A protein has these predicted regions:
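Flexible, low-complexity linker and terminal segments
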Residues: 1-210
Length: 210
């Protein structure tokens, strides 16, 4: 299990609430075939897009000999066989694009605070959240209201695109020198770059509301 977080959360456990583990939790491992399912198949093809969503079924090593497959760093076709055929290679790469579009419907949706009366919005990520919520409270007392969207995953979901469409200007707040979140929004979403105003704090001090 790989747990990815930004530096502030990784180094300061006061940034988040204590984890409460649910013993009843069962992870959704996706399209994993059981030994019985593999046995009932005529042939298992690791990279075959059966459902049309770009996500092939997979097996866990040791489940069933029929579910084994050979993987390599160079080209393979949709059936898992080695190939140097250009059309077969492109077929696999095109399937990955379908998988990418499907992922947009499966990743966690953003947290959104929205009012139709607000023309400006804030988009941010990770440990910027508390500082932004505090800043919005302060600004609200000054009759300056901004909507807020906290990104939780990439690729961006349709909710992110709608938030971009619904505002005249978006302030993208992040603790990153290069403004990576801003660049991803401009390159991956349909948005006029002039609408994006990048606000970056990257001097090593945790972000604060001022």
């Amino acid at each position: 299990v790989f747990v990815l977080s930004d530096l502030d959360i990784g180094m300061n456990d006061w940034m988040i609430k204590d984890l409460k583990w649910d013993d009843k939790f069962k992870p959704d491992r996706g399209k994993v075939l059981s030994s019985e399912e593999i046995e009932n198949m005529e042939t298992f093809h690791r990279y075959l897009d059966v459902d049309g969503d770009g996500i092939p079924y997979r097996t866990i090593p040791g489940t069933n000999p029929k579910g084994s497959y050979f993987t390599r760093g160079s080209g393979h076709n949709r059936f898992g066989g080695y190939t140097e055929d250009a059309s077969e290679y492109q077929d696999v790469v095109d399937r990955l694009l379908v998988k990418w579009e499907t992922a947009k419907t499966l990743v966690p949706k953003p947290a959104v605070s929205f009012s139709k009366s607000n023309e400006f919005g804030i988009i941010s990520i990770g440990s910027c959240d508390d500082a932004i919520r505090e800043a919005r409270d302060v600004m609200k007392k000054q009759d300056q209201n901004l909507n807020y969207l906290r990104v939780k995953a990439f690729p961006f979901t349709k909710e992110v695109q709608k938030f971009l469409d619904d505002h005249e200007m978006i302030f993208v707040v992040e603790q990153n020198r290069d403004g990576q979140l801003s660049k991803l929004l401009i390159s991956e979403a349909e948005v006029d770059p002039k609408k994006i105003k990048s606000i970056r704090l990257y001097n090593g001090i945790p972000i604060f509301s001022k």
